[in-house]
Swiss-Prot record:
InterPro entries attached to this UniProt entry: TMEM120A/B
UniProt topology in membrane: Multi-pass membrane protein
Extracellular side: 153-158, 210-218, 295-304
Parts of the chain that traverse the membrane: 133-152, 159-177, 191-209, 219-240, 271-294, 305-330
Keywords of this entry: Cell membrane, Endoplasmic reticulum, Membrane, Nucleus, Transmembrane, Transmembrane helix
The organism's place on the tree of life at top rank: Eukaryota
UniProt source species: Bos taurus (Bovine)
Name of protein: Transmembrane protein 120A
Family: Belongs to the TMEM120 family.
């Protein structure tokens, strides 16, 4: 090999030789990475199919056990209960395992994102995404408080109201997408606390299309005051729930992917019961909003379809929030009473 010429060109050639050596190392590392990736994909497929088979057999076993349980002799009942508990425990273990395996997206994620794999494969990535979701909720809640306050007390313009409602639509749409991704990654948020964000998205969309007029102005201040109060309560919930979840996770009593919610769950009983009056007041305000809208719909001057279409979601939100919270409180009192009787 000829010696490199002197001057800047020689320096460039020497740098190129060093880069060439590094590039060969990168190529080898990338080759190994692709091999490991193929091995990982095979392991994922094998693990997924094995879990699916096991879950199917567990369901069949649980069904047989349920059918034969009434006819079992009294001495076998304890063994049957023990087997039932073991089956439930195994199903919980499979749930944790599946959080680290690729899975098909649900209907909503498929419609929004297509067939993209949204499963995060490491604990660090899952926790980072969950933490980013919580921060997103906190920052947007503060922004919503400020904007609703501005619209309520400083500006009376349909344009700023529309911007506020558009922000609400975007916020709730984004929440539903992020929550669906978190559920795919092992978060245990479910039931009403997921569904009520879809209802809120619909409600905000209808509010966005409501034209300015007499009916809108009659409901405007009440809605903005409610939005301000709701965002304030959500801020309180995030602040106190995040601290409570941190303590419970440190004690091993909560899952690492558990999220703060805009309601009350059983794990909040210790330390967060002071939030209940704020929550119930907000629930009844939703009922008041629904009744106000139904009353406006009866006004002969009411021509907008948005009045009724906002009333029904507010009523649904009240019923879902109120009875879900009430069920948690009733269940806790029942468990405490049952525990004290045993003692």
């Amino acid at each position: 090999m000829h010696p490199p010429p002197p001057g800047p060109l020689g320096d460039c050639l020497r740098d190129w030789e060093e880069l060439q050596q590094d590039f060969h190392g990168i190529q080898e590392t990338h080759r190994l990475y692709r091999l490991k990736l193929e091995e990982l994909t095979k392991l994922q497929n094998s693990c997924t199919s094995s879990i699916t088979r096991q879950k199917k057999r567990l369901q069949e076993l649980a069904l047989v056990l349920r059918k034969c349980k009434p006819s079992l002799p009294s001495e076998a009942e304890e063994a049957a209960r023990e087997l039932e508990n073991q089956i439930k425990e195994r199903q919980g273990l499979f749930f944790d395992m599946e959080a680290y395996l690729p899975k098909k997206n649900g209907l909503y994620l498929s419609l929004v994102l297509g067939n993209v794999n949204v499963t995060l494969l490491s604990k660090q990535a899952k926790f980072a995404y969950k933490d980013e979701y919580e921060k997103f909720k906190l920052y947007l809640t503060i922004i919503l408080i400020l904007i609703s306050f501005t619209c309520r007390f400083l500006l009376n313009s349909r344009v700023t109201d529309a911007a506020f409602n558009f922000l609400l639509v975007w916020y709730y749409c984004t929440l539903t997408i992020r929550e669906s991704i978190l559920i795919n990654n092992g978060s245990r948020i479910k039931g009403w606390w997921v569904f009520h964000h879809y209802v809120s998205t619909f409600l905000s969309g209808v509010m966005l299309t409501w034209p300015d007029g007499l009916m809108y102005q009659k409901f405007r201040n009440q809605f903005l005051s409610f939005s301000m109060y709701q965002s304030f309560v959500q801020f309180l919930q995030y602040y106190y729930q995040s601290g409570c979840l941190y303590r419970l996770r440190a004690l091993g009593e909560r899952h690492t992917m558990d999220l703060t919610v805009e309601g009350f769950q059983s794990w909040m009983w210790r330390g967060l019961t002071f939030l209940l009056p704020f929550l119930f007041f907000g629930h009844f305000w939703q009922l008041f909003n629904a009744l106000t809208l139904f009353n406006l719909a009866r006004d002969p001057e009411c021509k907008e379809w948005q009045v009724l279409m906002c009333g029904f979601p507010f009523l649904l939100l009240f019923l879902g929030n109120f009875f879900t919270t009430l069920r948690v409180v009733h269940q806790k009192f029942h468990n405490q009473l049952h525990g004290s009787k045993k003692e």
